């Protein structure tokens, strides 16, 4: 398969994720869209690494996946805490910065 097709797929996935972040108000859905965007960037990194014959893109994708796994753990813990206290996962309802 042509590597350009993978870049098109990566751009499509990133666009879907960005639209989800901008249009949805549920924190869990927004979180999943951010993860979709990270995976799209990983796909682009691996595709560029494959096109140029280097392993740099694959290493960056691996480290991005490690950081994303940590983000999932911390992000879901925060979202679950907000849901338990506010009984809603909407980002519009969570004004936790008020004193």
From Swiss-Prot:
Record-linked Gene3D superfamilies: 1.10.287.3510
Domain of life: Bacteria
Any single biological process term in GO: ATP synthesis coupled electron transport
EC number: 7.1.1.-
Keyword entries, A-Z: Cell membrane, Membrane, NAD, Quinone, Translocase, Transmembrane, Transmembrane helix, Transport
Catalysed reaction equations from the record: a quinone + NADH + 5 H(+)(in) = a quinol + NAD(+) + 4 H(+)(out)
Membrane disposition: Multi-pass membrane protein
GO annotations of cellular component type: NADH dehydrogenase complex; plasma membrane
GO molecular function, one term: NADH:ubiquinone reductase (non-electrogenic) activity
TM spans (from-to): 3-23, 28-48, 59-79
Localization (cell): Cell membrane
InterPro entries, A to Z: NADH_UbQ_OxRdtase_chain4L/K, NUOK/Mnh_C1-like
PANTHER family, A to Z: NADH DEHYDROGENASE SUBUNIT 4L-RELATED, NADH-UBIQUINONE OXIDOREDUCTASE SUBUNIT ND4L
Function as written in the Swiss-Prot or TrEMBL entry: NDH-1 shuttles electrons from NADH, via FMN and iron-sulfur (Fe-S) centers, to quinones in the respiratory chain. The immediate electron acceptor for the enzyme in this species is believed to be a menaquinone. Couples the redox reaction to proton translocation (for every two electrons transferred, four hydrogen ions are translocated across the cytoplasmic membrane), and thus conserves the redox energy in a proton gradient.
Quaternary context: NDH-1 is composed of 14 different subunits. Subunits NuoA, H, J, K, L, M, N constitute the membrane sector of the complex.
Homology family: Belongs to the complex I subunit 4L family.
Name used for this protein in its record: NADH-quinone oxidoreductase subunit K
Classification lineage: Bacteria, Bacillati, Actinomycetota, Actinomycetes, Mycobacteriales
